[in-house]
Amino acid sequence: MKKKTSLSEEDQSLFRQLMSGTRQIAQDTIVHRPIRKKVTEVPVKRLLQEQADNSHYFSDEFQPLLNTQGAVKYVREDVSHFELKKLRRGDYSPELFLDLHGLTQMQAKQELGALIAACRREHVFCTCVMHGHGKHILKQQTPLWLAQHPHVMAFHQAPKEYGGDAALLVLIEIEEWQPPELP
């Protein structure tokens, strides 16, 4: 960093002489621009509504018929089984992760609903839900809840790098992105 060069006594006196008789200008024309909200910012009320809307699909009474042999897996009727195979092989990598460790069943349902809403809002196709081993309550309930949701296309037990049998990789049906129409 350069040192400031100091003025000689002669230069300082010349500066003071030239500046005598001047007055300070008052700045009174400051314009403050209003702070704009980010366009991508979603209101909290809308987030809570999306979470509630997506979590009402999860019922504890309804027991969908899932394969109990081998790895936990599910594919919706209108989805190709090849998608499930690609999910199992690790062709899809999850972009969002949800950890359900330590949550109650009600909290877990709400978080699953919020995750599905976030995936659809952010156009995320694959996500990972970590239910853990624990007392096997969430491990048993999570696949049953996911199979009930209409936007869940498929899920499969996660590979080791994403949690193994303590996690699920989930494919979410997302809406096609449409660019906004210009006026």
UniProtKB/Swiss-Prot annotation:
Annotated signal sequence range: none
Keyword check for Repeat: no
Mention one GO molecular function: RNA endonuclease activity
What's its top-level EC category?
Answer: hydrolase
Q: Which InterPro entries match?
A: Smr_dom, Smr_dom_sf, SmrB-like
Q: Name one Pfam family in it.
A: Smr
The reply on keyword Nuclease is yes
Any single biological process term in GO:
rescue of stalled ribosome
Smr domain location: 98-173
**For this protein, what is the EC number?**
3.1.-.-
Q: What keywords would UniProt list here?
A: Endonuclease, Hydrolase, Nuclease, RNA-binding, rRNA-binding
Family recorded in the similarity comment: Belongs to the SmrB family.
- Subunit and interaction comment: Associates with collided ribosomes, but not with correctly translating polysomes.
Described by its record, this protein's role is as follows: Acts as a ribosome collision sensor. Detects stalled/collided disomes (pairs of ribosomes where the leading ribosome is stalled and a second ribosome has collided with it) and endonucleolytically cleaves mRNA at the 5' boundary of the stalled ribosome. Stalled/collided disomes form a new interface (primarily via the 30S subunits) that binds SmrB. Cleaved mRNA becomes available for tmRNA ligation, leading to ribosomal subunit dissociation and rescue of stalled ribosomes.
Q: What is the protein name for this chain?
A: Ribosome rescue factor SmrB
Taxonomic source organism = Enterobacter sp. (strain 638)
Q: State the gene name recorded for this protein.
A: smrB
